[in-house]
Amino acid sequence: MNYAIEKIDENNHSLFDDMVFWREHGYEREPSQEPVSEQIKKELLNPDLYVYAVKVDGRYVGWISCVYIAKVGKWKGHGHVYVDELWVEPSYRGNGFAKALLKKADELKDKFNATGIRLYVNVNNPVAKNLYEACGYVEDGRAIFMEK
C-alpha cells in the first residue's frame, strides 16, 4: 500500500481535522475544506508540538504527536522526546504505519540530540505495548503516571 508521512501544518489542517472526526465518531465524513477552529489551529501551530500523519489515497489514516522537552541540571540540556499520542484507524492497522510514525519520534530525538524517547501505554492495551516493544521500547518501571 502506498502512503506518505506528512507533517501537519497550516496547509493540511482540514484533512487532519477530518481524521480526528473519524476517530472521535467512528465513521468517516466527506473530505472537507472547512476552516479548522482557531483553537485547533493555535494548538497545531505550537512550535513545540510535532504532529505527523499517514496519508493514504488522499486522506489521513493515522497520526503521532510528540513534544520535545529540554532538561537542565544533570541532563545538560538534553531532554526527551515525549510521544503524546499515536493512533491508526483500525482498518489500516497491520500495514506498518504505526512503526513509520514512531520513526518520526526517532528523527526528533536525533534532531534535538535528546537523551531518549518516552511514552506511556495503558496497561489494558497489550497490542500497543507489543508494538512499542517491537520498536525497541522497554518498560522502565520507575515512574507512576499521575493526572489532575
Show where each model-derived region lies.
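Short, Lys/Arg-enriched, disordered terminal segments
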Residues: 1-4, 107, 111, 148
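Acetyl-CoA-dependent GNAT
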Residues: 3, 7-78, 82-84, 102
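Conserved residues at the C-terminal ends of beta-strands
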Residues: 67, 89, 120, 143
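Short coil/turn motifs at secondary-structure junctions
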Residues: 69-71, 91, 124-126
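Residue-level recognition of the GNAT/N-acetyltransferase active site
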Residues: 84, 89, 93, 122
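Conserved acetyl-CoA-binding loop-helix of GNAT-fold acetyltransferases
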Residues: 88, 94-107, 130, 134
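Conserved active-site alpha-helix within GNAT-family acetyltransferase domains
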Residues: 99, 123-142, 148
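Conserved GNAT acetyl-CoA-binding A-motif
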Residues: 102, 109-120
